Regions:
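Polar/acidic, low-complexity leader/linker segments enriched in S/T/G and N/D
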Residues: 1-41
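Short, solvent-exposed beta-alpha or beta-beta edge segments that form flexible loop/patches at the rim
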Residues: 27-61
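Oligomerization/assembly interface segments of phage tail-like spikes and tubes
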Residues: 47-71, 117-130, 264
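Solvent-exposed loop and beta-edge segments used for protein-protein assembly and interaction
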Residues: 56-58, 84-86, 97, 115-119, ...
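Compositionally biased, low-complexity regions
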Residues: 56-57, 61-91, 98
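Short beta-strand and beta-hairpin "edge-sheet" elements
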Residues: 89, 93-134
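Short, charged, solvent-exposed linker or helix-capping segments at domain edges/interfaces
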Residues: 133-141
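Intrinsically disordered, low-complexity segments enriched in serine, threonine, and glycine
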Residues: 142-290
Length: 290
């Protein structure tokens, strides 16, 4: 199977480990499949069977085995060391004919045999975030007003629309990967009145009735960014170019919504001014195994 494998450090420097006749011959990549789960159970007293305490996946371990070919091996070995440094951040880009993904982790070891006739090596990378993520970002939009202005510009005196109010306060997005969090961007539509309160307490509902609600006023020019991804859940308000943490405005009972596999439908509501909001949902497909 043909594949592309590139390692990139936090400075953006890359080393291409894709199989070539005179560079690297990657013989094995471990850690592409789903990581092993940890399952904890306890026995019933005097009864058959047991009950589940918890089950989770701790981390992903990607191990790359390779050989070095051609001339200039020592130079390429030092180039490898420059990019792949133990304990440092690394991004793994992996691409086949059907998938283009990346994972992020930290280098555990980078070992190369220096004194053998056939130069070989192995790189071990630990990924606290267990998922592979698609290179592409996918978007879904909701807007209370949809632009209707177009060219050529009408020349008659008859009225023509500049915008159309939405009659449906829902939007949908397809998730082709595993269940994952997402980033939600809530913006107030432009207004001629500076610092006008355009909306109050927006709420996002999923199909199951679970919701994420942020109390308070949204002023002209405000942008609220919500991230529901495990390990980086945040609620941030950008006002007049200044970011501030507004996690305390998340209403009790709210759920950190996620994208289930397949089609997801969301509904936008607000105490006031829902038609003056623009909502953008962004996510990358995530995969336990590729």
């Amino acid at each position: 199977m043909y594949f592309t494998l590139i390692l990139e450090n936090e400075s953006g420097e890359q080393v291409n480990l894709s199989t070539t006749a005179n560079q690297y011959m990657t013989s094995k990549i471990e850690g592409l499949n789903s990581p092993a789960g940890t399952v904890s159970t306890s026995s019933y007293a005097g009864m058959n069977g047991s009950y589940l305490n918890n089950a989770f996946i701790e981390k992903r371990n990607v191990v790359i085995s390779f050989a070095m070919r051609g001339i200039g091996i020592e130079k390429r070995r030092h180039q490898l060391y420059q990019v792949v440094k133990p304990s440092r951040y690394i991004k793994i880009w992996y691409k086949t004919a059907n998938i283009d993904v990346y994972a992020e982790g930290y280098v555990e070891t980078c070992e190369v045999s220096n004194f053998e006739q056939q130069i070989s090596g192995q790189i071990s990378i630990l990924c606290p975030d267990i998922y592979w993520y698609s290179r592409d970002i996918f978007y879904a939009y909701y807007s209370g007003v949809t632009g209707a202005f177009h060219f050529p510009f009408p020349e008659s005196d008859a009225p023509f629309p500049l915008g159309v109010y939405a009659t449906n306060d829902t939007f949908s997005i397809v998730n082709d990967g595993d269940e994952t969090g997402f980033t939600l961007r809530i913006e107030a539509l432009p207004s001629d009145i500076p610092q006008e309160v355009v909306a109050v307490t927006p709420t996002i509902y999923n199909e199951n009735g679970e919701y994420l609600q942020i109390k308070g006023d949204i002023l002209t020019g405000d942008v609220i960014t919500v991230t529901t991804k495990t390990g980086s859940k945040t609620v941030t308000l950008t006002r007049n170019g200044v970011d501030s943490n507004i996690l305390n405005r998340l209403v009790s009972g709210s759920t950190w919504l996620t994208l289930k596999e397949g089609t997801n439908i969301f509904r936008v509501e607000a105490v006031r001014g829902v038609k003056k909001l623009r909502v953008t949902l962004m996510h990358r497909n995530s995969y336990l195994g590729v």
